[in-house]
Amino acid sequence: MPKAGIHPRYEEARIVCGCGAIYETRSTKPGVTNVEICANCHPFFTGQQKIVDAEGRVDRFLKKYGNVQPRTKR
């Protein structure tokens, strides 16, 4: 039997995903917890690849460091 008064309360909780899926569970953190991705919308589980905007990052990198010349030995 666990000691009385030292364990957190284990209450009803709701997990809400960005895709609209809602999961009812129990947790020591009661209330609503919002998550960005879940098993219903994660590419690993759905088999669909989402295209990430990596081109913007590459362009930003090249804009910042693209014209830098390599250092020469002295």
From Swiss-Prot:
Pfam families xrefs: Ribosomal_L31 (PF01197)
Alphabetized UniProt keyword annotations: Metal-binding, Ribonucleoprotein, Ribosomal protein, RNA-binding, rRNA-binding, Zinc
UniProt-listed SUPFAM superfamilies: L28p-like
Cofactor: Zn(2+)
GO cellular component: ribonucleoprotein complex; ribosome
GO BP terms, alphabetized: translation
UniProt key word rRNA-binding: yes
Disulfide bonds: none
GO MF terms held by the record: metal ion binding; rRNA binding; structural constituent of ribosome
Ligand binding (Zn(2+)): 17, 19, 38, 41
Metal-binding in keyword set: yes
Co-factor remark: Binds 1 zinc ion per subunit.
Chain's role: Binds the 23S rRNA.
Family assignment from sequence similarity: Belongs to the bacterial ribosomal protein bL31 family. Type A subfamily.
Assembly, per entry: Part of the 50S ribosomal subunit.
UniProt xrefs under HAMAP family: Ribosomal_bL31_1
The protein's name in its UniProt record: Large ribosomal subunit protein bL31
Protein source organism: Gloeobacter violaceus (strain ATCC 29082 / PCC 7421)
Gene: rpmE
